[in-house]
């Protein structure tokens, strides 16, 4: 008689206990991997949502309702995409907090690429927030884009260019959808560079112990 359940249990213990990671790396180092999982979830669900979405001010909200009600498993995709965005930010802020606490900012290339990733992620989230074109979407698009007018000399020109006119309208929504679709690919590319730069020197050692003894 072979106890497969016990074998599986032993295999799982071996898998999680004998990972090639030093004892000087704590649970806080999991959040980088979790961010990659979030990125995969958001890209996948976002692609399927984009198939059914209509970037038109008269049809955008209706297309969201259509996804929720008529598209098979559309409600799961929409909710996963929305909740996944919140989870993304929880993970990234925890990831940053760990970096600040343990002094990861001393690795300048990795830190600067990570800072750039955060800025692009915030921009992507903002563009996505506007897409349903409800009251809050319109308010957010108006208020946030108006901040560009504070830029000396170029402010008004940049705002008009982003709006596609002298007020927020259909061209604005089309541009925001295009930007929301393309920026995740910039995030994927920069994430690859971020990981390559990290593996170039290795992660920091908060406990200062020699991991070779493990």
From Swiss-Prot:
Residue ranges the record marks as coiled coil: none
Per the record, membrane topology reads: Multi-pass membrane protein
Chief location bin = mitochondrion
Q: What is a biological process (GO) this protein takes part in? A: mitochondrial electron transport, ubiquinol to cytochrome c
Primary role: Component of the ubiquinol-cytochrome c reductase complex (complex III or cytochrome b-c1 complex) that is part of the mitochondrial respiratory chain. The b-c1 complex mediates electron transfer from ubiquinol to cytochrome c. Contributes to the generation of a proton gradient across the mitochondrial membrane that is then used for ATP synthesis.
In terms of InterPro entries, this protein maps to: Cyt_b/b6_N, Cytb/b6-like_sf, Cytochrome_b_N_euk/bac, Di-haem_cyt_TM
Cofactor: binding comment: Binds 2 heme b groups non-covalently.
| Stored Pfam families | Cytochrome_B (PF00033)
**UniProt keywords, alphabetically:** Electron transport, Heme, Iron, Membrane, Metal-binding, Mitochondrion, Mitochondrion inner membrane, Respiratory chain, Transmembrane, Transmembrane helix, Transport, Ubiquinone
Subcellular location per the Swiss-Prot or TrEMBL entry: Mitochondrion inner membrane
Please give the family membership noted in the entry. Answer: Belongs to the cytochrome b family.
Record's subunit section: The cytochrome bc1 complex contains 3 respiratory subunits (MT-CYB, CYC1 and UQCRFS1), 2 core proteins (UQCRC1 and UQCRC2) and probably 6 low-molecular weight proteins.
Q: Where are the transmembrane segments?
A: 31-51, 75-96, 111-131, 176-196
Q: Which domain of life is it from?
A: Eukaryota
User: Which source organism?
Assistant: Lachesis muta muta (Bushmaster)
Positions binding a ubiquinone in this chain are 199
Task: Output the Gene3D superfamilies linked to this UniProt entry.
Answer: Cytochrome Bc1 Complex, Chain C
Keyword presence, Membrane = yes
Q: What else is known?
A: Heme 1 (or BL or b562) is low-potential and absorbs at about 562 nm, and heme 2 (or BH or b566) is high-potential and absorbs at about 566 nm.
- Where is heme b b562 bound in this sequence? 81, 180
Where does this protein hold heme b b566?
95, 194
Name of the protein described by the UniProt record = Cytochrome b
- Gene Ontology terms for molecular function: metal ion binding; ubiquinol-cytochrome-c reductase activity
Q: Give the protein's cofactors.
A: heme b
Q: An example Gene Ontology cellular component term from the record?
A: mitochondrial inner membrane
């Amino acid at each position: 008689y072979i106890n497969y359940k016990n074998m599986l249990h032993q295999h799982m213990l071996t898998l999680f206990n004998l990972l090639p990671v030093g004892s000087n790396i704590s649970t806080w180092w999991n959040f980088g991997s979790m961010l990659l999982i979030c990125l995969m979830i958001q890209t996948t669900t976002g692609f399927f949502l984009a198939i059914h979405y209509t970037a038109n001010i008269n049809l955008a909200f209706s297309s969201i309702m259509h996804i929720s009600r008529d598209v098979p498993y559309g409600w799961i995709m929409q909710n996963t995409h929305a909740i996944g965005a919140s989870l993304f930010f929880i993970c990234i802020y925890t990831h940053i907090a760990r970096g600040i606490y343990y002094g990861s900012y001393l690795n300048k290339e990795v830190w600067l690429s990570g800072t750039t990733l955060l800025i692009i992620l915030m921009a992507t989230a903002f563009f996505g927030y506007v897409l349903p074109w409800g009251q809050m979407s319109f308010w957010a698009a108006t208020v946030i884009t108006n901040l560009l007018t504070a830029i000396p000399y170029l402010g008004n020109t940049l705002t008009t260019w982003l709006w596609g006119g002298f007020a927020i309208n259909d061209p604005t929504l089309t541009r925001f959808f295009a930007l929301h679709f393309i920026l995740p690919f910039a995030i994927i590319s920069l994430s690859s560079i971020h990981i390559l730069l990290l593996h170039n020197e290795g992660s920091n050692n908060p406990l200062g112990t020699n991991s070779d003894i493990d």
